[in-house]
């Protein structure tokens, strides 16, 4: 079994660096990393050039450019089209997986013959206030995690029937069977943000 780790990135060089450091060193040699780049950011290009040159003989890293054009589903579907793995693990550039999640995901897939695995996600927003939470209907636990386990449809079979739909707040279709990982930190994605980035994203989403 091999997995394609599909990443969408836009002007997130520091976040991409952290994510790639984990994927390069914790995934298997037969796995690949597929990166869809929106925009023309020099810092992102520098990170990608650095990783592809340093690890070209150890890891298959595919990079291509595509304009988002206010359609997140189309962007993610383009990632699917560029993947060759048996399964696809989609990760946004500002997320990163717990290392134990990466080490156990193939065992999970072997034990659960399903089309889709839902992954819990740890969301944190630096600078968030009670007023923000009330405004957006969010809840925060005693660890500062927002809406946990906030399950995400991220690991799925590569199939012509499985795709993303809706330009914003996109969701996946075509999966007939699925499983949820336990709501445990070591099996989660991390999604850290600042309140400034969150508000900027909310404003952008409202234009789509």
Predicted regions and their residues:
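Catalytic-site signature of metal-activated, phosphate-bearing donor transferases
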Residues: 73-80, 87, 96-208
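Short, acidic/glycine-rich phosphate-metal binding loop used to engage nucleotide
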Residues: 64-72
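Conserved acidic residues
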Residues: 31, 61, 84-86, 94, ...
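Acidic donor-binding segment of Leloir-type glycosyltransferases
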Residues: 20-65
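A short acidic, amphipathic alpha-helical/loop segment
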Residues: 18-22, 47, 78, 103-105
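Solvent-exposed polar/charged
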Residues: 25, 81-82
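N-proximal low-complexity "stem/linker" segments adjacent to membrane-targeting elements
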Residues: 1-25
